[in-house]
From Swiss-Prot:
Cofactor requirements of the protein: Mg(2+)
Signal peptide: none
Designated gene of the protein: MUS81
Protein name: Crossover junction endonuclease MUS81
UniProt xrefs under Gene3D superfamilies: 3.40.50.10130, Crossover junction endonuclease EME1, DNA-binding domain, DNA polymerase beta, N-terminal domain-like, Winged helix-like DNA-binding domain superfamily/Winged helix DNA-binding domain
This enzyme's EC code(s): 3.1.22.-
């Protein structure tokens, strides 16, 4: 066979053009993706000689790259050309390595000793798995837990290896994650680092080479014993070893007090970028809402009985409570793996429980170690996978969830977005909307936005954030109101206590207090339907009409304060109006609105069909 030209770019451009034409004929949405790839390929100046270079081009994902690789392989076969190693799949590379190995072994028998020495000096470098990868964790687990070299089952290895790996050992077909950390076991076997025996169950052993490499890895990371040795050391070790994937603590970490800085400087944990600091902008905005609302009556403080403005409260010292992470029970990895978050966080040394939450997907609470009473701490997360984010943008849940997070009065609200292994068509269609929505989350909504590669990075962030929260614990003033009228009253009470107790006087040596609500009050008051005002309920009713976003619903509610006023507008004021004119009433009523607040003809007719049709 002859050798193929190094640069495949001209062929790739030709093939992508053909795919774009075929997609156009079929009416497929993939035509937009192919056109974007085509534009990037034409502007790429360097030659494309391997699969890694091809994947580095913008918009070329794993699936597209694999399709193009197959076309290259077919082209080489039809034209009797040698397929470059960079475009071979794993099986082809393995077969080529075996052929080269056999050729080398047969040749070495007839070469001199000097020739053999020269050949061995040019041999391939020894395989060493990356730190905290699946292969690394499997070797460490077998070395630590299989002292007698009797072998271990897959389940036992995973249980021991999980603390030493940043990725999950189970795949998730729902998010197109078909490979897990356990896939590295095959690589270790191919490199003669582990061996297997039996079928059901299959038993895994370390080879002599595997024992030697595992011992070197153990020494390199300074690991002295298995995690079972000490629970406290276990948690510190696990957390210390998990801060290495770009979402961890760095020197830009902002602290509110010298005591906090001293506390973290002595901790084995490195510093996380932009996590827990006082969100002054949200606090000012909430205080402004309180000033614009009803003016509270003159407040009386009975410090002896711990009553402020007729509302009882408790004081918890830092030592009186522990930090617990609550995960919403709807947050799952897949239908077959519903307990992924809880299991993974507990492995990382985090106390985690699963229960339905009224707002958000991840909530940090303080539990009194004596009474068991629970209070909501000032940290809340909303988690979205990219495809779910697209759906929530289209149906209006995106804006609603952000508003509900702000109603909690929690100072540190995070919006966590997870990327997907392969994007669906709807993600490409809404790429511009996603970008603008995420930008608004940081600017207009003033929430912390964090974007992660996969579910494992999200879990690692939650674990590391929990550690920081534990180190920055404050004395708590736990509010215990007897009667809360609605969600706005819940927020007003919280802000009232903050204005009283969280503003330290300049000449007083007051401890650092945080005012928080009981978790039971949080659950009762912040549900989607619990204790809603007529205004909030009416807005939700309007948003059930397809096409009515939160912005449009608010505009309609400002013009028609109650459902009754909208019904009277159609059935009383315009009772004798022609039906065709009635269909356009909403469009004409809001014709002066701008942007996404304007109501079009089709939407006006939908609103008429629901509210104005006899």
């Amino acid at each position: 066979m002859s050798v193929v030209n190094d640069d495949f770019k001209p062929l790739l451009i030709q093939w992508v053009e053909e795919e774009a034409i075929n997609a156009t004929k079929r009416g497929s949405k993939m035509v937009d993706l192919y056109n974007k790839i085509l534009f990037q390929l034409r502007g790429y100046e360097l030659p494309i000689c391997d699969l890694k270079t091809l994947k580095s081009i913008k918009y070329v994902g794993d699936k597209t790259a694999n399709q193009l690789r197959k076309k290259i392989a077919k082209h080489c076969k039809e034209n009797e050309l040698t397929l470059p190693r960079g475009f071979m799949d794993v099986a082809e590379k393995h077969r080529l390595d075996l052929e080269e190995s056999n050729l080398t072994s047969s040749t070495s028998t007839i070469k001199t000793t000097n020739k053999r020495a020269k050949t061995s000096s040019k041999s391939k470098p020894k395989y060493v798995p990356k730190h905290r990868s699946g292969g690394f964790a499997i070797l460490i687990a077998l070395y630590l837990y299989d002292k007698d070299r009797n072998g271990m089952t897959k389940e036992r290895i995973i249980a021991g290896a999980t603390p030493y790996c940043d990725r999950s050992f189970s795949n998730n077909a729902a998010s197109k994650e078909f490979y897990s950390a356990w896939s590295s076991a095959k690589t270790l076997e191919n490199h003669n680092l582990i061996s297997t025996t039996g079928r059901s169950p299959k038993i895994y052993f370390l080879t002599d080479e595997g024992v030697s490499l595992a011992q070197q890895l153990k020494t390199a990371i300074g690991l002295s014993s298995p995690p079972e040795g000490s629970k406290k050391n276990d948690r510190n070790m696990i957390m210390e070893q998990s801060f290495d994937n770009g979402i961890r603590l760095d020197t830009s970490f902002e602290l509110s007090s010298p005591a906090g800085r001293a506390m973290l400087s002595s901790s084995p944990i490195r510093r996380i970028s932009n996590p827990v600091h006082s969100n002054r902008a949200i606090q000012k905005m909430l205080e402004k809402e309180l000033r614009n609302g009803e003016t509270p009556p003159s407040s009386q403080h009975d410090a002896g009985n711990r009553i402020y403005d007729g509302i009882k409260y408790e004081v918890w010292r830092k030592e009186d409570y522990e930090v617990i992470v609550y995960m919403d029970n709807r947050e799952i990895r897949s239908r077959a793996d519903r307990d992924h978050f809880q299991t993974r966080l507990q492995t990382l040394g985090v106390k985690c429980e699963v229960k339905p939450l009224s707002s958000g997907d991840v909530l940090w609470v303080g539990r009194n170690t004596s009474t068991g009473t629970e209070a909501v701490l000032n940290y809340l997360c909303e988690r979205k996978r990219l495809d779910d984010l697209c759906d929530s943008i289209k149906d209006g849940r995106f804006q609603e969830q952000k508003n509900r997070m702000k109603k909690t009065g929690i100072k540190h609200c995070y919006y966590l977005v997870e990327d997907m292994v392969s994007y669906q068509d709807k993600v490409y269609d809404l790429m511009d909307s996603i970008q603008s929505s995420l930008t608004q989350t940081m600017t207009t909504a003033r929430l912390y936005l964090r974007r992660f590669k996969d579910i494992d990075e999200t879990t690692a962030f939650i674990a590391s954030n929990t550690k920081v929260i534990e180190n920055l614990k404050s004395n708590l003033i736990v509010i215990k109101p007897q009667d809360i009228k609605n969600q706005q009253d819940y927020l007003n009470i919280l802000l009232k206590f903050r204005n009283k107790f969280e503003k330290t006087q300049p000449h007083q040596d007051n401890p650092d207090y945080e005012c928080v609500q009981l978790f039971s009050r949080f659950q009762d008051m912040l549900g989607k339907t619990n204790q809603m005002t007529v205004k909030e309920m009416f807005i939700l009713m309007l948003m059930t009409i397809r096409g009515v976003s939160l912005e449009k619903a608010v505009v309609i509610q400002n013009r028609f304060p109650t459902p009754k006023s909208l019904l009277e507008y159609y059935h009383t004021e315009h009772a004798t109006t022609d039906t065709n004119i009635k269909r356009d009433l909403m469009m004409n009523e809001f014709k002066d609105q701008i942007g996404n607040k304007k109501i079009g003809k089709a939407l006006s007719e939908k609103i008429y069909n629901v509210w104005g049709k006899p």
